[in-house]
């Protein structure tokens, strides 16, 4: 509940559509691989099961983040593929019993995107293109975090997503 309040407070201070640079500390992420939605409805069921498992695990193990986010790997971004590669929840350092990825400390280009999940892919493309237009190098993965989602709002157009892309500044 505390994490949800922090996210709602942050959501009230940002301007949707704005891209800015932010510095983040290292963070540990428990992950599940995202299924390939293009091939079968069965994969959607597997995705829902994985997300449910991830949320349940996070609650039982004291994760500071209850809502799973998405990770789009750098290699996918470079190919122009904006579908998520992993789903994640933040976990404390030293967590075991789950596949982990580390979000490196450093500078991130951050886009606060307001809109449905279906519009997220275009927003990821916009963020990647902005980074390249500014002369920055992509230096890592893109992380999606829900600030306002279907739990907080029934209107998908009011969802607020935080998209963070690791960059290298000149």
Could you describe each region identified by the protein language model?
Residues 1-170:
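A solvent-exposed interaction/effector surface
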């Amino acid at each position: 509940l505390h994490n949800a309040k922090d996210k709602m407070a942050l959501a009230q201070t940002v301007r949707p559509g704005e891209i800015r640079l932010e510095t983040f500390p290292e963070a540990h992420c428990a992950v599940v691989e995202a299924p390939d939605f293009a091939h079968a409805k069965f994969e959607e069921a597997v995705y829902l099961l994985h997300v449910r498992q991830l949320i349940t695990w996070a609650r039982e193990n004291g994760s500071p983040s209850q809502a799973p986010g998405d990770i789009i790997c750098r290699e996918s971004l470079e190919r122009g593929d904006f579908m998520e590669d992993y789903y994640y929840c933040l976990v404390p350092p030293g967590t075991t019993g789950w596949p982990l990825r580390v979000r490196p400390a450093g500078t991130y280009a951050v886009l606060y995107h307001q809109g449905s999940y279906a519009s997220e892919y275009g927003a990821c493309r916009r963020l990647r293109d902005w980074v390249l237009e500014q002369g920055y190098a992509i230096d890592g993965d893109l992380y999606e975090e829900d600030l306002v989602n279907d739990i907080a709002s029934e209107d998908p157009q009011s969802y607020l997503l935080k998209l963070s892309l690791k960059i290298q500044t000149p």
